[in-house]
Amino acid sequence: MPLFSLRPAATLWPPVLLGSQFVFNIGFYAVVPFLALFLRDDMLLSGGLIGLILGLRTFSQQGMFIIGGTLADRYGAKAIILAGCVVRVAGYLLLACATSLWPIILGACLTGVGGALFSPSIEALLARTGTHSQANGKRSRAEWFALFAVCGELGAVIGPVAGGLLSGIGFRHIALAGAGIFLLALLVLFFCLPADGHTTTTRRRVPWWTPLRQPRFVAFILAYSSWLLSYNQLYLALPVEIQRSGGREQDLAPLFMLA
């Protein structure tokens, strides 16, 4: 594949997906961990409102994955990935410019919706290319997903460091930097992802609630939901604890690296 072309790629290069996950997590973890501090210190919101906004942001992403996956099946993964990048850029720009409550809520929700669009689509592409790789006797699909997870965790480590370095000049600049990261990702993915039209196969579709009839799958959902419930407390609890213990805003970055 040429290093640069003005036309979208004809074939999918799997490392593009790994790099996307790495960059997406940098753009996410450079911004979102510092959102609670911005809402508390700059916008002077109460703890209840901060928790509500963070909860809406989380639901807008994790709670909407099924919609993002459905749209990817219908319109193609590439289109939905690019749309997700656009939506997240819009959310970050709104957070950077907002001066009142409702634009902040909208911006936070848009950042979540963006993730709900591109995350399932990228994983679907990885599953497809991993299956093809395994069928050709190359790297297995499980190995590709393991590398995908490693790249995501690396981004989750570097992101808070990047946000911490920018925290001295204010959250709005952090949000603008996050928007820039996703705008760059949008441009790169436009050229590096092959065209992917909507699904035209005649395979039988089943209702989305069908997997809920499987007890093991329901148990997995409940276990993962419990993990999300506990993990997302960090976005609110860590800033509060740092303030209580007399720490600085920059101290948040290494704590999220460890988390």
Residue spans of the language-model regions?
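Cytoplasmic helix-loop-helix junction between adjacent transmembrane helices
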Residues: 107-152
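Helix-loop boundary and gating motifs at the non-cytosolic
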Residues: 8-58, 218-253, 257
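C-terminal membrane-cytosol helix-exit motif in multi-pass small-molecule transporters
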Residues: 180-198
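Residue-level signature of mid-helix packing/kink "hotspots" within the transmembrane helices
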Residues: 58-66, 156-157
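Paired small-residue
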Residues: 20, 91, 102-110
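Helix-breaking motifs and short loop linkers at transmembrane-helix boundaries and internal kinks
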Residues: 44, 76, 97-102
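Structural signature of the two symmetry-related core transmembrane helices
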Residues: 79-94
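Juxtamembrane intracellular "pre-TM" segments in multi-pass secondary transporters
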Residues: 1-11, 194-222
